[in-house]
Amino acid sequence: MSVVTLKKCRVVSGGRPVPAPFAPTGAHGKQPRKVSTMYPLNGAVVLVTGANGGIGTQFVHSALARGASKVYATARTPRSWDDERIVPLALDITDPDSIQAAVKAADDVTVLINNAGASVATPGILTHSDAEIRNNVETNFLGPLFLARAFAPVLTAKEKSAMIDIHSAMSWYAVGGIYSATKAALWSVTNSLRLELAPEGVHVVGVHVGYVDTSMAAHSTDPKMDPVDLVTTVLDAVEAGEYEVLADQTSVQLKAGLSAPIEAVYPQLARSKS
């Protein structure tokens, strides 16, 4: 994959992000604590949600390959690992008690990776069941938010720390029903967390990507990104101190579409007006 690095943003070739014209400040205008803009994984203690497979498993392996001293590999029912540096940890991000137990068990974390997510079988938001809507809201939005809030004191207590939120290109493309809606909400939360945690030295990174070659995307015949390539791109960005990762052309194009007329993004709306 060809990648070009711009100020505080990593995109695949052809992207056109515009650097922010102002430095991030906290909720009350406090300037960020002076820390290095580099965030090496060497020696880090990492917690990965949704670590049992797919992207989560790759984050576990790649963090260790970059020198992480320990990785908490979390899931509702965590799998076993053949590496003493990997600590299986039960965590249900939709359960407040489970979140608090994880904070207590993993109070040495320096990098939090919000990777766990849910999807739906059909895209129509009006046809989703109540259970599908609640599951996506709790897993894709409230869970990562509550986990970030719970771990914020742990991360701010460290000399250097980072948080990585895995969004989706569907954050900017509303054809995925409740999945798109919850990923858009998480994107907004990540932006808020970044501003509030920057003054405390916590670097918050948002990741956008289209389909990735995992079981969650098995239904799609569209091109898919290899999890290895995705995680490599993300961790390169984290170590470079970047704020946002647009991991594929789909993400680049959809973000650019935010400033386009809505009929250009959704041609069916233009047809309905004719």
Labelled PLM ranges:
Residues A148, T182-K183:
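Active-site helix of classical SDR
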Residues G206, T214, A218-A260:
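C-terminal helical subdomain
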Residues A148-R149, N191:
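A short, exposed helix-loop element centered on a Lys and neighboring polar residues
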Residues S119-R134:
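Conserved mid-core segment of classical short-chain dehydrogenase/reductases
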Residues D108-V109, L155-H167, P199-H203:
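Active-site loop of short-chain dehydrogenase/reductase
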Residues D83-D95:
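Rossmann-fold cofactor-recognition segment
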Residues N52, G56, V60:
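N-terminal Rossmann NAD(P)H-binding glycine-rich loop of SDR-like oxidoreductase domains
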